[in-house]
Structure formats: C-alpha cells, structure tokens
C-alpha cells in the first residue's frame, strides 16, 4: 500500500472529499512480494487489465521496513512497465533519494520525478518548496495543474529571494554525502548494540533513511527523545507520541532543525505501532551526526541501565 498520507490523498480512507477517487481518478496497486520487491507476475496482470495512464514508483521505504529501491531496480521496473503497457507514463516519488547514487531515475526511462527541497535537493538551506523534473511536456502539465491554464510555471508561490534554492541545490550532493556517512556510522553502532537495522552499514544505499527496529515502544520513544536532545535547535523540547493529520497511529518526531520540517537535517520519526521502527535521517555534517548518535546510544544503552 502507499504510505499513510498518500492513502488519504488517493481516497482509501473513509473521508473522500477532495481525493483523487472523488475526482474520478481510478487507482489500483500491486502488493509487494515477501522480499519487499515487485511481484512482476501480478504486476503484468494489473498493467494489462488497467492500462494505467501513470504508474507510480515510491523510491524510498516510507514508514515501511522494506528496502528502498535503487536506481538499478527502478530502471528494471520502468523497462517492465514500458514493455507491458507502452502508453503508461512512469512517475517516481524521488524523496530522500536525490544525489544518493551516481545516476537518477530519469536517466533510465522514467518520464518524470518529484521531490522536496527540504530534503536532499535543498542541501539543508532551502526553507520550503519542491521540484518536478522530467519530460518538458509533463513538467508543463504539472505547472498548469498547480496554477492555471495559460499561466503555468510563469507564475506561482515562491520566495522573494531565490538565493537559498540555488545555493542549496549547489551544496546538495555534498550534504547528501555527509548524511549518508552519518547513517552508515549509525547503522554500524546500533547493530553492535543489538538493534535490528536496515540497511546494514555495509549494504548499498539509495537514500538517507536509516531504519532502527526496537520491537518495543519504550526504547523507540526514548531514543527519539535523545535525538531531539542532541539537535542544534530546541534541544530542551521533549517529543511525545501525538495524533497527526493523515496517520491512523500516533507518531513521534524529533526534529530540532534550522529549517522547520527538514529531513535533510538530523531527525527521527515513526508511527507508534509494531514493530516500533524509527526512521532516522542524518544530517548536515557527519561530525554532528557521529557525536549526536554516540550520545544517544550512550544514554539509551548505558546510563539507563546504570
């Protein structure tokens, strides 16, 4: 299934007002196989049956424990879609994945992608915004839908100064590299402490996210509090599980960041439900990631136990 908030947008939740389904846009999905990969046999049946206008691939894992999809895997998925349903467009939700590998999905047949500028592509500097990239006609179609026909991307909400977008985009590859180094260190340390982590420190990475599975809510919540405590902003604030729009379960979030809501910076969040997995993102600098995660582990695994 799509991640929680997308289920609301599509119209899979009880309230349908303003959703894609209410607007007459049909939706179907193919459950993943037991390994978290694509069930190509079932996907072929659905593609031939529906001949969809757009096939959506979510690169990152969202609030799931499957592996995020690499660019090579997306390349294979795209070739499969184009073979079975040649008229279908392929769209990739590229959030958390930009600059994590040498190549991007649009280099391998993906028609267009989108992502957030308060994640990888904004380099930790952009204050807000998102991007759409791909075939010119599709980008223009998105702009027309966002504003109005005849206006398109010539108008729209933006900041008075574009400096943050340009500088952030320039720094994004380096900042993403720092974040990935921080996650590799975190995975190695937390696995040594007995935590189940995915991906493991030595496994290939295609995004910023490090999943830590605690199996009990108490450790998950306490570790989240330690992430907040070791953040540069609002380190005195104590996160607690709370109801959030778009989610069925309570969610806990640690995000003591310079840019509100930024997951390019050191942060962690997750729904309070089994297997009590926390999704951690690091961070603007490897130096801070290493200090913060070491402090969090020290407090959770040593000081709590005397």
From Swiss-Prot:
Highest taxon, organism lineage: Bacteria
SUPFAM superfamilies named in the record: PLP-dependent transferases (SSF53383)
Lineage: Bacteria, Bacillati, Bacillota, Bacilli, Lactobacillales
Family matches, as InterPro entries: Met_g_lyase_put, PyrdxlP-dep_Trfase, PyrdxlP-dep_Trfase_major
Any matching Pfam family: Met_gamma_lyase
Family of the protein in this entry: To L.delbrueckii similar ORF in glnA 5'region.
Name used for this protein in its record: Uncharacterized 33.9 kDa protein in glnA 5'region
Annotated Gene3D superfamilies: Methioning gamme-lyase, C-terminal domain, Type I PLP-dependent aspartate aminotransferase-like (Major domain)
């Amino acid at each position: 299934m799509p991640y929680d908030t997308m289920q609301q947008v599509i119209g899979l939740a009880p309230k349908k007002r303003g959703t894609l389904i209410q607007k007459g846009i049909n939706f179907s999905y193919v459950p993943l196989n037991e390994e978290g990969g694509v069930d190509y046999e079932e996907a072929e049946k659905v593609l031939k049956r529906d001949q969809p206008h757009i096939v959506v691939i979510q690169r990152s894992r969202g609030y799931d424990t499957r592996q995020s999809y690499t660019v090579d895997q997306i390349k294979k998925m795209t070739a499969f879609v184009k073979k079975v349903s040649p008229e279908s467009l392929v769209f990739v939700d590229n959030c958390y994945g930009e600059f994590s590998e040498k190549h991007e999905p649009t280099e391998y047949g993906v028609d267009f992608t989108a992502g957030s500028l308060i994640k990888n592509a904004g380099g930790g500097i952009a204050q807000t915004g998102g991007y759409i990239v791909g075939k010119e006609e599709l980008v223009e179609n998105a702009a027309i839908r966002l504003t109005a026909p005849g206006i398109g991307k010539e108008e729209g909400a933006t900041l008075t100064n574009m400096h943050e977008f340009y500088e952030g985009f320039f720094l994004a590859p380096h900042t993403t590299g720092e974040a990935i180094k921080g996650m590799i260190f975190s995975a190695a340390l937390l696995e040594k402490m007995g935590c189940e982590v995915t991906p493991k420190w030595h496994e290939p990475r295609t995004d910023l996210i490090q999943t830590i599975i605690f199996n009990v809510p108490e450790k998950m919540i306490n570790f989240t509090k330690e992430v907040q405590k070791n953040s540069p902003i609002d380190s005195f604030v104590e996160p607690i599980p709370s109801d959030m729009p778009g989610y069925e379960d309570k969610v806990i979030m640690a995000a003591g960041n310079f840019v509100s809501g930024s997951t390019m910076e050191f942060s962690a969040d997750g729904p309070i439900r089994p297997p009590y997995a926390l999704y951690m993102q690091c961070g603007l600098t490897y130096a801070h990631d290493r200090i913060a995660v070491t402090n969090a582990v020290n407090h959770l695994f040593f000081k709590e136990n005397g």
